[in-house]
Amino acid sequence: MEGVEEKKKEVPAVPETLKKKRRNFAELKIKRLRKKFAQKMLRKARRKLIYEKAKHYHKEYRQMYRTEIRMARMARKAGNFYVPAEPKLAFVIRIRGINGVSPKVRKVLQLLRLRQIFNGTFVKLNKASINMLRIVEPYIAWGYPNLKSVNELIYKRGYGKINKKRIALTDNALIARSLGKYGIICMEDLIHEIYTVGKRFKEANNFLWPFKLSSPRGGMKKKTTHFVEGGDAGNREDQINRLIRRMN
């Protein structure tokens, strides 16, 4: 009787397969926790880096502005005129249709990625691009955007070209995946590269989908007349910023 009772009290052995399964599950859980922790630390480090970059850019922009003011004051004090450096960046907006226009004009508008009315793009200014703008000047409004305009356009209307699709830039991770190899990992990097026309301007600008702007508040005056004659077409220099405000 005692032998039977002892047999009843014995705990059945756990099968080896179950032990292995439990061990594998525990190891997998540890790996997942480690990966989750590593990702959390990476996000934290990236947020800190983005914050530091934004702070650095703000300081750089402020320094650029102060230098311009100082140079203008020095020139005025010496009785001279201060001539700012030639603009390196333009923002171009298509304002007219192209029915009946020459193939050359049509081709240039395609090269500028202005396929629809009220599309806008950034353009790096050089001899070749200025000649292109002159060819299509009756069909575009363009000028020199300030930092505020570049910032607001990208933050409010910025879409990226990701896998040939138009994707809203709602997360810095989208920018990092596409432009991280060029050192551009966040919105502030993208804005800085465009505004300063940096070494990777071409890659940054091609990543940005052409901006789809709204019809300007108050409407257009005369699309077929040049800006200097009271119309809308052509180079309006710094006044492009007012038009951007009306269309953004």
Swiss-Prot record:
It is found in: Cytoplasm. GO terms for molecular function: DNA binding; identical protein binding; mRNA binding; RNA binding; structural constituent of ribosome. One of its GO terms (biological process) is maturation of LSU-rRNA from tricistronic rRNA transcript (SSU-rRNA, 5.8S rRNA, LSU-rRNA). The modification Phosphotyrosine is found at Y139. Its main location: cytoplasm. Sequence repeats lie at residues 7-18, 19-30, 31-42, 43-54. Residues 7-54 are annotated as: 4 X 12 AA tandem repeats. The modification Phosphothreonine is found at T17. Keywords: Acetylation, Cytoplasm, Phosphoprotein, Repeat, Ribonucleoprotein, Ribosomal protein, RNA-binding. It holds the Pfam family Ribosomal_L30. The modification N6-succinyllysine is found at K127. The modification N-acetylmethionine is found at M1. PROSITE patterns: RIBOSOMAL_L30. The keyword Ubl conjugation does not apply. The modification N6-acetyllysine is found at K124. One of its GO terms (cellular component) is cytosolic ribosome. Component of the large ribosomal subunit. Homodimer. Interacts with DHX33. Component of the large ribosomal subunit. The ribosome is a large ribonucleoprotein complex responsible for the synthesis of proteins in the cell. Binds to G-rich structures in 28S rRNA and in mRNAs. Plays a regulatory role in the translation apparatus; inhibits cell-free translation of mRNAs. Belongs to the universal ribosomal protein uL30 family. PANTHER family: 60S RIBOSOMAL PROTEIN L7, LARGE RIBOSOMAL SUBUNIT PROTEIN UL30. This is Large ribosomal subunit protein uL30.
